[in-house]
Regions:
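Hydrophobic faces of well-ordered beta-strands that scaffold small-molecule active sites
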Residues: 18-23, 44-46, 72-76, 96-98, ...
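Alpha-helix-loop-beta-strand connector modules within alpha/beta enzyme cores
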Residues: 55-81, 86, 114-124, 141-147, ...
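Catalytic cores of alpha/beta
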Residues: 32-37, 74, 79-94, 98, ...
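N-terminal amphipathic alpha-helix/helix-capping segment at the start of soluble metabolic enzymes
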Residues: 1-22, 133-148, 203, 210
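C-terminal alpha-helical cap/extension of soluble enzyme domains
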Residues: 125-133, 152-162, 192, 198-244
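Glycine/Thr-rich beta-alpha phosphate-binding loop at enzyme active sites
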Residues: 177-198
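Conserved N-terminal beta1-alpha1 strand-loop-helix module at the mouth
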Residues: 1-72, 78-79, 169
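Conserved anion-binding
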Residues: 95-170, 179-184
């Protein structure tokens, strides 16, 4: 769908290992830089699903990251907010993660809201958009964004795991795992052939081989990098541990 990807999107499509760190949107510029350099990390993930986060705070945080040249992946508040993805992106994130994805309709709506025409139907606007100052012409901006922005769909149930190959539609860059909610789902399916979160991660990684769509897992600390890399996970999201 997006043959000429650039930057981080291109690296993900090529199956390169990508490292990210989770940070609060209240983090100041000095700590952002210290965390990114400590990895070194390729992107920062910020969350609104389980965290209080105003639009103004998101604009401010993304502005700081833009000044530092740091890629921001943003998890939206709820699955049903997929129709607002374009609005969220107008506030400055470089990518979006949609939590608790299970239905084809969610993916279709996310793709339409994420990409500009002809790949999608995102509306043009927003002064805080990443890259807005460098691409003033709307058509030029849309073409650039469609090769740059990164869309994750988060899978957090056994049902979503077994349908991963269907949810991984063209234009989706990554399927990410929500291990805690997935653990609850596994307990509801005690006789399923997938018994653990690790089983699910390995299953999805195998099912996406050769598609150019990455698998992301929240791995806690850097000590777990090799374990999940060996499973086929190429996007590793860690908790920022450096103290400043």
């Amino acid at each position: 769908m997006i043959p000429n990807s650039i930057g981080l999107k291109k690296r993900m499509r090529e199956g390169q290992q990508i490292l990210g760190a989770s940070l609060s949107a209240d983090t100041d510029s000095d700590r952002i830089r210290a965390v990114v350099d400590s990895g070194p990390y390729d992107f920062i993930s910020v969350d609104s699903q389980h965290s209080a986060l105003s639009e103004e705070r998101l604009v401010s945080f993304c502005g700081l990251c833009n000044e530092l040249g740091v890629f921001v992946q943003f998890r939206i508040k709820h699955t049903r907010n997929a129709y607002l993805i374009g609005n969220y992106l107008d506030l400055g994130p470089c990518g979006v993660e949609v939590p608790q994805t299970e239905l084809d309709e969610t993916v279709v709506e996310s793709l339409n809201s994420f990409y500009f025409s002809p790949e999608g139907g995102r509306s043009f606007g927003g002064r805080a958009r990443r890259g807005a100052a460098d691409h003033l012409d709307p058509v030029d901006y849309g073409a650039w964004w469609n090769t740059y922005g990164i869309l994750w769909m988060q899978i957090e149930s056994v049902e979503a795991v077994t349908r991963a190959h269907i949810l991984a539609k063209p234009g989706v860059d990554c399927l990410s795992f929500g291990p805690t909610d997935l653990m609850f789902s596994l307990k509801v399916h005690p006789n399923h052939h997938l018994k653990t979160v690790d089983d699910c991660v390995a299953y999805v990684a195998r099912s996406l081989e050769g598609t150019g769509i990455s698998v992301c897992h929240r791995i806690g600390s850097s000590e777990n990098r090799q374990k999940f890399a060996d499973m086929g996970v190429t996007v590793l999201l860690e908790s920022a541990s450096i103290q400043t």
